[in-house]
Amino acid sequence: MRRYRIDSMKYEQRMNAGASGFDMSDWNNPYNASPPSSRGGDDDASSVNHSRPRRSRLDNDIPQPRRPILIQPARPVSQKSNRQGTGMSNGSRGLNSTFNGYDRTYSRYHQNSSRGPSEGFSGAPSARNASGYASDYANSRAGVGLLPNNHREPVRPRSTAAERYANASSMRNGFVYDSGESDKTSEELEEDEEEEEVRNFYMEGRAQGSRSVTNTLASEVYNSESESYYYGVVKLGSAIVDHVFRTMPPPEKYYKMPPIDRVAYVFYCAVNNKPYNNIDEFHVIFNREFYSYRGYGDSKDLALFKVCKRMQEEFSLKQLEADRLAYEKARQEAAESEKLDFNQHKIEEREEPKLNISQPEEVLSNGPLHYHSCLQFATIGVGGKLVIIKPAGTIDSITGHVLSTSSVHVDDLKTFLHFDEQSGKVIESVQNFKGPLIAGQTPTHSVRLYIQRQIDALRQIRNAGDVKKSEVVDALLVWQLLEIMVQQHGRVTGPDVATLLTNASEELGEKTGISSNGTSESGSKFEAKERFNKYLLGGHINEAVESAITDGLYADAMTLIRRLHPNDAKKIEEIEARFMNLRSIDDPFATLVAVSSDQPPPILTNSAFDDDNNWKRHAAIVLANLNSQTAMQTIYHLGLLLAKRERNCAADFCLLVVCILAGYDPFIPVAHDGDETSRKHIGLVHSGSNLLNRVDGLSGTAGFSFTDLHATDIFDYALRLGNNNVDSPLAKSIDYQLARIEYAKKLSSFGGFATDAFRYCTEVARSLWMYVAAFDKNAMFDLCDLAESLQYMAAATPDESGWITTMRGMLGAAPVQESQQHVPQPQPVENKSISSEAKKWHDEHQAPLEIGSRNDQQHNDKTVEKPIAPGRASLPPPTLVTESSSESTFTDKSDSSVTVAASASRTSTLTSSTLPPPPSLPKTIEKPISTPPPISKNVVPEMTPPAIVKPPMPTLSMPIPPVSTPIMVSPQPIPIPKPVDASIAKSPRSELDDLWDTSPPSNQTSYPPAPRNIQPSYSPAPNFANPTAPSVPTPPPAVSSAPVLQQATLGQASIPNAKTTAPPVPQKQPELALNERKASKGWFGSIKEKVIKSIPSANQMILPDDSKPSIVWDPVQKRYVGAGVEEEVVAAPPPVMSAPHLMGGGPDSNKSSTNSLRSARSGVGSRYLQSGMATSQAPAMDTGMPPMMPPTMPMSFSFMPAPTEDDSSEYVDPFSGEPTAPSESLSKQNND
C-alpha cells in the first residue's frame, strides 16, 4: 500500500481551524477560555460525570488563533482581600496571593485581550461570589502547573450557579450574566465569605475524588514553557489542543509524565479523536519508539516529530483500510442485488426450457451465486504447461474482445513468471546458457559468449567498495581458464595457465616479493631482477639467462642453468649457495629453484602466503617452466592450502589446472586425515556465484547455484572437446550428476524447456551409465520418471527413450557386488611378454591397459574377446548429438556387446564403502613433497586414464528391450589428450581422415579406416530393428588393422608404422572375420581408399602387402635380388634412379616418377620411392593382415631401391637415417 505524505500547510490549516500562518510565536499570544456550562444554568453536580461537556455559547467571541486552554483552579481567597483596593472583582486575588504554599502572580488580562479589565468573561460584569462546577473546572488547570510562571491567573469564570439572565437591553446573543454588583451589608458579606471558604474546602476534596480534570498536583515539577515549545515542534495548533482538553480530559497519570510524553499523548488524541485508555501502556510504547530514534543520533525534537508523524501515517493507513473494506462491502451488496434482479428476470421467462443446473434460477434454488460473471479456470500440466479454459463471455486479455464461445489455451508457465523479478532472472539465465553442452553439437562460440557475459559482469563489480577485489580476480581466473579451454578445444598447456596468473597478478599491482636482507640494492639492480623475473614468468629461459649475464646477475644465471640444465655442479654450487642466502623466501625465483630441485617450496609454509595475491606469481613461475611431478604436486598442495583458507575460487582453479595438466581427478571425495575438515575435492566449480548474484540477482533455488553448475558443465564440455566426446572425470561425480538432475527438474517446471530437460536426462544417464551402482536408487528412479514424463513433450523417438526401460531393469535387478563380477579383458593373440608386463603394471597402478592400441595393433592382427552379456541392460543410452565437422561418428548395428567390453576399461572406484585416499605417485624423486597428489606417472603432463569399471550385469531372466548403441573402436582407455599434441600439425593424410572418416550408415557393421585416436566415439542411434539376444555369446568382429597415424612428439617427424626387425608370423584370420571386414567397406569405402592412396603424405609411407616377397636381400652382393630387379643406371651426380619396369604389363600397372629420389640421401627422410601415387586392384591395408617388416612390394610393382654410389658395405636404414646392418632373421626370411 502506498504511503501518504502529509502536506504541512494543509495539515496546519485543518488542525488550527483554518487559521494559517501558525508558528512558534503564537504560543506566547494571550488567550481566554470559557469553561463548559450546564444546560439549565444551575450548578448541577451530575455535570461532573459528563464525558464530553458542552461548550458555552459565550465561547463564540474567543479570538482566533489561540493557544491551548490551560486553566488553573481558583485559590480560596477571602472576600476581605477583594475589598483592599486591588481593583479586581469577582473573587480575584492579589498580586502576591498564595495557594497551597506556592506563590502565584498573574494579571487578569493581557494587552491584546478582547475584554477590558472590568468586564466579565462574556463581556458583562461578573459577580465576585460566583462558584460551581465551571469554576472548579477552571481552577483545577491552574493548580497543576500548566500555566507558565510569568503568566498571571485569569479571573475565576462565572459558574452556572451564579449565572443570571440580564435585561433584554443588555443581552448579548441572548445570554449574559448579571452585573455582579451586590447591595448586601458587611455582615452578610462576612457570612458569604465564610461560606465560600467552606465551599472551597469541600470542592478541593471533590475535585480530587471526582473527574481527573480537577486534580491538584505539584506545579513546579515541569515547566509549561517547554510543553508549549513541543506543541510547536509537532505543529499542533491551539484550537486542537483546546478541543482535546475540552472533549477528552486526560487521566490523572497524564500530569505525572514529562512534557514530551504529554505532548505526544495530546497529539494521539487529536489524530485518533479518542483518548488512549491505558496511560502506562502509552508511556511505555512512546518511550520505546522515542529512544529508538534517539539511539540513531536524532535530537529530542526530531525524535518527537518522527513519532508523531508515524502516528499520523498509521491513522491514515487505518482510515484507508476501513474505506476499502467499506467499499468492498458496498460492492458485494450491489453485486448481490444485481444477481437477485438477474435471477428474477430469468425466472419470469417460463417459456424457455431449463434443463441445466448451471442456469441461474436453478443455482439460486440450490444456493446463492458466489460470482456474478464467468471465471477462467487454469491448471498446470506436465512439462510446465499451463492449461487455461476461457468460457464464453470473458474478455480476451490480448485482443480485448468478448469471447463468444469457450476456448482452451495452452501456454508455458514461464510466460507468467516474468512478472516476478527473481523468476525472470532465473529464466533469463537458463535461456542464455545453451545446455546441455554436447561436444560436436553445441557450438563453441555460444559457450564462449556465455563465458564472456560472466566475465563482463565480474568486471562491473570489481571496483565496488563493498567487494573484495582479490575475490573478484580469483573468480575471473576460473572463467578465463574455462574460456581458454573452450577456445583451444580442451588443450591447455602450463604456459597458457601461467599467462592467466601473471595477468591477474599484474592487475592487482602485486610486487615481485624480492627483498634484500642486510644489503642495499640500487635502482638498476632492482630493475634487472624485475626484468629477469619477467622472462621467467613467460617461460623464456635462454632470454632470462642472457638478461641476467648482461645485468651482472651471474648468480641468478648460474643457479637457473644449474637447476634446469645441469652443468658443472662443483663450480656452480658454491656460487649458488652463497647467492641463495641473500634471496627472500617470498621470491618466485626461490620457489622455482626449490621445485626444480624436487624440494617443497617455502611458500607453502611461509607466513607471507597470507597475501591474497602472492600465490599467483609462485604458481605461474612453476607452470611456465616445469611440467614434472613435483611441479604438479606443488600446484595441488597449493590448492589444498587455499581451500583450507576458504579461498574457494582460487583453490578450484589450482585443482582444475592439475586435472588438465596432470590427469588428477579432483571431483572424487578424498578421505580426511584425522580431525581435518578442509575441502579436498570439488563438488561444483566455485565460479564466484555470490558475486554474480549482486549483478543479475540470480540465486540457486534447488540447493545449489545455477552459475556454479553452468561453470562445471562448461569444464566437462571442454574436456570432451579434447577427447572426442567420451568420458571425463565428471562422469562419476555424484554431486555433479545429482545437481544436473535437479536442474533438469527445474527446467521442466518452467515450461518451454521440455526438450532441453529431456536431453539433460539422456546425457546424465549416458555419463553415469557405467557407474550407476554408485548412485542412489531413488535419484536414478527420479531420473527415469522425469525422462518418461518428458519424452512425448520432447518428441523423442523410441530409440532415444529406450534407455529408460533398460535403466529401470538395471535398478530393479538384484544388486551384484562389483568384486564378484568378471568382465574378460581383451587379450592379444601374441606378444605374451608385453601382455604380462602390462598386466603387472595395471595391477600396481589400477589403470587400464594401453599396450594394445599403441604397440600390438601396429603389427598384430588381434581379436577381441566378447564378454558374456546375458541381457543388454548395461548398454548406454543413445546419444543425441549430430554429426559435426570436428569429429567423426560411426554406427554399428551388430551385437552391441562390444560396448560392454570397451567400457570395461573405464574407471569405477565409487562403489567402495569408504572414500579412497589419494593414490601415491611412483617414487621417482628423492625429496617428495609431503603427501603427493594422485598424478599420472608420465613426466609430460597428460590425463591419467581412469581405472577399469565393471558394469553391473543383470540377470538372465530380466526382460529388457534392446537399445541401439554406438560402436566402440577398441576397448582402450579414455585418456584426455596431452597438451603436447595440441602443437603438432596434422599431415595431409590426417586432414583427409577428418573429411572422409564417416561413412553413411548401412545394414552392416562399419569400422573407421584409420582411426586417429584409439578412443570410443558415440553416434546417433539409427532406427534399426531390435535384434534378439543371442543364446550363445559369439566373439565380436575383428577390428580392422589399418595403420594408425602416429603423432610425432617434441618436434620430431613422424615415421611409418614399421620396424627394422623381422615381424612375427601373422595369424590366419577366420573366414567369417574376413568376410565381415570386406563387406563393411562397401562401394563408398573402396572409393575412399583409392582416393586416399592417390594423395602422397609427407609423414607416412603406405606399403603394399608383402606376404609373398619376390625381392630379397642378398648379403653377399649387398643388394636386393629377385625377379625384375635391374641395375641402377649411374648418372651424373647427384645420382638419379632409373625408372623401374613394371612387371606383368597388365592394365592395372602404373609407372612411378624417377625424380623422387633426389632427396633420398638427405639423411632424415626415406631413401625409398614413395608408392602413394601407385594404385592397385589388390586388397589394401584393411584386409586384416598386419604390415610386414621390412617393407616389400608385390610382384606387380616391380620396385627396387637404388643402391648408394660407393661400394661401401654400410647399409642405410631408410627409417632411421643411420647406417645399420640388416638382421639375420630378415635375410633368412627373405631367402626362404
Curated annotation (Swiss-Prot):
<feature type="compositionally biased region" description="Low complexity">
    <location>
        <begin position="896"/>
        <end position="914"/>
    </location>
</feature>
<feature type="compositionally biased region" description="Polar residues">
    <location>
        <begin position="26"/>
        <end position="37"/>
    </location>
</feature>
<feature type="region of interest" description="Disordered">
    <location>
        <begin position="18"/>
        <end position="134"/>
    </location>
</feature>
<keyword id="KW-0931">ER-Golgi transport</keyword>
<comment type="subunit">
    <text>Interacts with tfg-1 (via N-terminus); the interaction is direct and is required for both the localization of tfg-1 and to maintain the distribution of sec-16A.1 at endoplasmic reticulum exit sites (ERES).</text>
</comment>
<dbReference type="Pfam" id="PF12931">
    <property type="entry name" value="TPR_Sec16"/>
</dbReference>
<feature type="region of interest" description="Disordered">
    <location>
        <begin position="172"/>
        <end position="193"/>
    </location>
</feature>
<keyword id="KW-0813">Transport</keyword>
<feature type="compositionally biased region" description="Polar residues">
    <location>
        <begin position="1149"/>
        <end position="1159"/>
    </location>
</feature>
<dbReference type="InterPro" id="IPR024298">
    <property type="entry name" value="Sec16_Sec23-bd"/>
</dbReference>
<feature type="region of interest" description="Disordered">
    <location>
        <begin position="866"/>
        <end position="942"/>
    </location>
</feature>
<feature type="compositionally biased region" description="Polar residues">
    <location>
        <begin position="1168"/>
        <end position="1178"/>
    </location>
</feature>
<feature type="region of interest" description="Disordered">
    <location>
        <begin position="815"/>
        <end position="843"/>
    </location>
</feature>
<dbReference type="GO" id="GO:0070971">
    <property type="term" value="C:endoplasmic reticulum exit site"/>
</dbReference>
<dbReference type="GO" id="GO:0005793">
    <property type="term" value="C:endoplasmic reticulum-Golgi intermediate compartment"/>
</dbReference>
<feature type="compositionally biased region" description="Low complexity">
    <location>
        <begin position="67"/>
        <end position="76"/>
    </location>
</feature>
<comment type="function">
    <text>Plays a role in the organization of the endoplasmic reticulum exit sites (ERES), also known as transitional endoplasmic reticulum (tER). In association with tfg-1, accumulates at ERES to positively regulate secretory cargo trafficking from the endoplasmic reticulum to the endoplasmic reticulum-Golgi intermediate compartment (ERGIC) and Golgi apparatus.</text>
</comment>
<dbReference type="InterPro" id="IPR024340">
    <property type="entry name" value="Sec16_CCD"/>
</dbReference>
<dbReference type="GO" id="GO:0012507">
    <property type="term" value="C:ER to Golgi transport vesicle membrane"/>
</dbReference>
<dbReference type="GO" id="GO:0070973">
    <property type="term" value="P:protein localization to endoplasmic reticulum exit site"/>
</dbReference>
<dbReference type="Pfam" id="PF12932">
    <property type="entry name" value="Sec16"/>
</dbReference>
<protein>
    <recommendedName>
        <fullName>Protein transport protein sec-16A.1</fullName>
    </recommendedName>
</protein>
<feature type="region of interest" description="Disordered">
    <location>
        <begin position="1140"/>
        <end position="1232"/>
    </location>
</feature>
<dbReference type="GO" id="GO:0006888">
    <property type="term" value="P:endoplasmic reticulum to Golgi vesicle-mediated transport"/>
</dbReference>
<feature type="region of interest" description="Disordered">
    <location>
        <begin position="972"/>
        <end position="1069"/>
    </location>
</feature>
<feature type="compositionally biased region" description="Polar residues">
    <location>
        <begin position="1046"/>
        <end position="1060"/>
    </location>
</feature>
<comment type="similarity">
    <text>Belongs to the SEC16 family.</text>
</comment>
<feature type="compositionally biased region" description="Polar residues">
    <location>
        <begin position="1222"/>
        <end position="1232"/>
    </location>
</feature>
<dbReference type="GO" id="GO:0007030">
    <property type="term" value="P:Golgi organization"/>
</dbReference>
<feature type="compositionally biased region" description="Polar residues">
    <location>
        <begin position="817"/>
        <end position="836"/>
    </location>
</feature>
<feature type="compositionally biased region" description="Polar residues">
    <location>
        <begin position="78"/>
        <end position="100"/>
    </location>
</feature>
<keyword id="KW-0256">Endoplasmic reticulum</keyword>
<feature type="compositionally biased region" description="Low complexity">
    <location>
        <begin position="1194"/>
        <end position="1203"/>
    </location>
</feature>
